[in-house]
Regions:
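Cytosolic catalytic headpiece
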Residues: 1-186
Length: 186
């Protein structure tokens, strides 16, 4: 059983795409300001991209992290929510305008992160990690030895399937919360 991030991939994701629905002029700045308080590797990718673009980060109040789902906080009096599709939908945010781009990004092996402001979708920032050059060969060798190889990931099923195809992993368990990975192994 392999965890995707840092085992199959290098564990150093980078921002690849920004889909802005036009509600805010500075999606990356807002996202990085919120994500700077998170320890997630995807958050680090967003902050790094903002720094690369010399964007100043804004102060965040009332920051809350929900592991495996996302984060929330207040910036200049507005409530921001960032994370996977599940947390966005659980909070009643209409993401119909973002479903098609999110699906396309996931099918490309990228992880779409949704952002909302005061309950309205404002965009997606996608990130991707580089697959280690040895991953496909290692999986092929394990399969040749009769070892059943499984990848666990918190990513959505489309992103997981794209990585699965690139590496040749026979079975994937996607959308696994961090606290549930041990249970999946058993």
């Amino acid at each position: 059983v392999l965890d995707k991030t840092g085992t199959i991939t290098e564990g150093k994701p980078h921002v690849t795409d920004l889909v802005d629905v036009g509600r805010v002029p500075n999606l990356l700045q807002l996202a990085a300001s919120l994500e700077k308080n998170s320890e997630h590797p995807l958050a680090a990718a967003i902050v790094a991209e903002a720094q690369k673009q010399n964007l100043s980060l804004l102060p965040v109040e009332d920051f809350v992290s929900e592991p495996g789902k996302g984060i929330r906080g207040r910036i200049k009096g507005k409530i921001y929510l960032a994370g996977n599709q599940k947390i966005i939908e659980e909070n009643g945010v209409d993401i119909r305008a973002l479903e098609r781009p999110a699906a396309r990004l996931a099918e490309e092996g990228k992880t779409p992160m949704f952002f909302a402001q005061d309950g309205q979708a404002i965009g997606i920032i996608a990130a991707a990690d580089i697959i280690k050059p040895t991953s496909a060969q290692a999986v092929a060798e394990w399969k040749a030895m009769g070892i059943d190889v499984v990848m666990l990931t918190g990513d959505n099923e489309r992103t997981a399937a794209a990585i699965q195809k690139q590496v040749g992993i026979p079975r994937v368990v996607a959308q696994v919360m961090p606290q549930d990975k041990e249970k999946e192994v058993r």
